[in-house]
Amino acid sequence: MDFATTTEQRDLADAARRHLSERFPPSRLAATADHGLLDPEDWAALDRQGWLDADLGPVDLALLAEESGRALLPQPWVGTAGSALPVYQSAGLPLPGPAALVDSSDTCAAHDTPDWRISGSAPGVVDAHLATELVVAATTRQGVALFGVAPSEISIAERDDIDPLRRYATVRLLHAPARLLADPGRTAELLPALRLRSAMLLACEAVGVADGALAEAVRYAGTRTQFGQPIGSFQAVAHQLAEAYAEIETARSLAYRAAVTLNGDGAAEAVACAAVAGPRAAVLACEVALQVCGGIAMTWEFGLHLRYRRALWLDAHRVTSVPPHDVLAALLLS
């Protein structure tokens, strides 16, 4: 299996890194975390940069997800690109803007001629409060179908969570008007693919979070001196950084493998491996960075806490109700 990226893919990742570092400096991330204000122009800029192009393949998306994690991108791109964009592409419709998938078994749809109406609830929809339209998986008489619902037609209760840059919301629908995006037959193919795609992108995002934390720790270890020399020269520090590096490289290889195999045989196993390794590497790298950076890492201004919060969020988040460890165990033991 060839994991080597093409020149075009490397250029895409480099351009994404430059764009995000210029647009989202630490001071802006801190302000967004404190006040929760997002600039719609940021989403438009991502669109102009090609982050939502229909011709992006899984590897392209994986590289963008990694860069979004490195920069802690405070826009709902991962959720939109992972679990909503393919629905609109399949339906031949333009993406209306940021979108969130409501993947719940507690929603049902009835055909109230000429419209569809949806009722039900979902307790943990990521970035639902930022969506211009929600893609709702709802049960019909013929099976589960996918619908588009305007946020103005439903109740969205945002809730505080460990990561102030990515929040859950409880979504409640009561006879909400909806438009059909995918019938039950198409949905039966789309939903499993959406879940795999979303899990793959989150694993790649976790690699970016981890790599960003390690870079901060290495930079600090090279400039902070103790006993007349950089603290990075001490084995107690160097060994921790090396351990984090090894964990990140393993997670990166598994994430790229998941991207390469996403549309082929073995995708479920590859994605499960990446979903286990990515968040684990992110948590470890952030905890190592906190230890290496010492007291300054505990300050709100330093910003490392935002990386750690995202790592913990990624480690706790589940694309489906089945944890990836259980998915992997079932696949290996079957």
Region spans (language model):
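Alpha-helical interface subdomain recognition
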Residues: 1-71, 196-334
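FAD-binding core of flavoproteins
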Residues: 75-78, 82, 86, 91-215
